[in-house]
Structures are given as structure tokens and as C-alpha cells.
Amino acid sequence: MLEKTTRMNYLFDFYQSLLTQKQRSYMSLYYLDDLSLGEIAEEFDVSRQAVYDNIKRTEAMLEEYEEKLMLLHKFQARQQLVAELKQLINEEEHVNDKMKQVVEDIEKLD
């Protein structure tokens, strides 16, 4: 469950601008603010089922966006490469300072 929540938080972060205001609100309250379906339903004066359906549809949309655009995948790949570069730099005693700067610049991109 925690893995799914983390993934949805990342996907929401990358693709929220592609969602409607209602979808953003529901996802933000559910995943970021940790409100229950009932609490969200009460706030928007709709049924719990309506909130559930909207969140499930939005989750599917986010997964579809990721399948096509792969922003999360690319982000994770960059993070992995930066971690490997850092490890190599730390293992090598006389690494060029320029290489260290390049790694720092790559990290700033995210």
C-alpha cells in the first residue's frame, strides 16, 4: 500500500497539471492530506462512491500518462545514474573537480 501511495504521489506531482481541478482536489486530499473517502465526500457534498470512482479513474489516467510520457521512469533513471556517479567519485581519490560540478548540475535539474 505504501508503495502505491508513493507512486501515486510521484505521478500526481509530475502530471497534476493535466488533471481537472476536481481531480486535483480529490487526489491531493486523498494522497497528500490523507483524508478518507468519507471526509472528502462530506467536504464536496457528494457520495463516498463518487469520490472513490473519481480517484480510481484519475489513478488510471495518471498511469496512462506515465505509460506514454515516462516522466517518472526517466526521473528514477536519472536519480540512479547520479547515485552511481557519486559513488564512483567518492571511491576515486583524485577525481577532477569539474566532474563533481557536473554531477551537482545534473542533480539541480530535478
From Swiss-Prot:
Q: What InterPro entries does this protein map onto?
A: RNA_pol_sigma_r3/r4-like, UPF0122, UPF0122_fam_protein, WH-like_DNA-bd_sf
Q: Which domain of life is it from?
A: Bacteria
What SUPFAM superfamilies does the record point to? Sigma3 and sigma4 domains of RNA polymerase sigma factors (SSF88659)
Record-linked NCBIfam families = PRK00118.1-4, PRK00118.1-6, YlxM
Please state which protein family the record places this protein in.
Belongs to the UPF0122 family.
Q: Name the job this protein performs.
A: Might take part in the signal recognition particle (SRP) pathway. This is inferred from the conservation of its genetic proximity to ftsY/ffh. May be a regulatory protein.
Q: What is this protein called?
A: UPF0122 protein Bcer98_2498
Q: Per the UniProt entry, what species is this protein from, by scientific name? A: Bacillus cytotoxicus (strain DSM 22905 / CIP 110041 / 391-98 / NVH 391-98)
